[in-house]
């Protein structure tokens, strides 16, 4: 790599980045002609015509057209009294003369919050004497008397009426429940309908409305078919056959015995009904 001194013959008139000082101007003996001229004397060539009219400054034109002194300009936080009318004129225009109490306290009116100088005397006279309420003037005493006095009397009358009603309710005894004659109760207790089972059925029927009794069917269709077949051959069944049926149908000995008893009673009833039917109709 070549050194910087080898590449540059004259190093005294150059600025070296590695140096901590600048080369003084006396070392530069000669300067070009274009650097020695000042900006004011140096001619400048323009590509457009040089006979254009001179343009005035924008701020001077603005202040001159609007007749405002450019030296003072706009005051940023100065007093703005010249922009608004006087306070007295505003109060005079906003507030009319107050003549009555209703005008003194207008509802939802922004002018009620302004205090006019012409109305200070009437306001001071109105607020000067404080009434019995301690807050409102004496002019409101009549309204205070009618409002609070009337409400107190109404409340007292209401309490008196309630006390009278309460005392009358306590004085009148509650009517005793009517006692039913003993003659009706005894036959009901002695009758068979008043048993525990019948009473439960009555209460359940009364609570749930019309209720149909569920048909009891402890035997399946297959069991009933086999029992009916055995009953068709023999109305009475012996012990050996009963045990055989109970094992085959997965029933107890007592269940088979009870079924044959009920079936014989049913057959007897059917025979009786059949006999009665044919006796009433001899032609059949």
From Swiss-Prot:
Residues 163-214 are annotated as: Disordered. The gene is hoxa11a. GO terms for cellular component: nucleus. Residues 212-271 bind DNA. PANTHER family: HOMEOBOX PROTEIN HOX-A11, HOMEOBOX PROTEIN HOX-A11-RELATED. GO terms for molecular function: DNA-binding transcription factor activity, RNA polymerase II-specific; RNA polymerase II cis-regulatory region sequence-specific DNA binding. Its main location: nucleus. InterPro entries: DUF3528, HD, HD_metazoa, Homeodomain-like_sf. It is found in: Nucleus. Belongs to the Abd-B homeobox family. Residues 189-198 have a biased composition (Low complexity). CDD domains: homeodomain. Keywords: Developmental protein, DNA-binding, Homeobox, Nucleus, Transcription, Transcription regulation. Sequence-specific transcription factor which is part of a developmental regulatory system that provides cells with specific positional identities on the anterior-posterior axis. This is Homeobox protein Hox-A11a. It comes from the Eukaryota. GO terms for biological process: embryonic skeletal joint morphogenesis; regulation of transcription by RNA polymerase II.
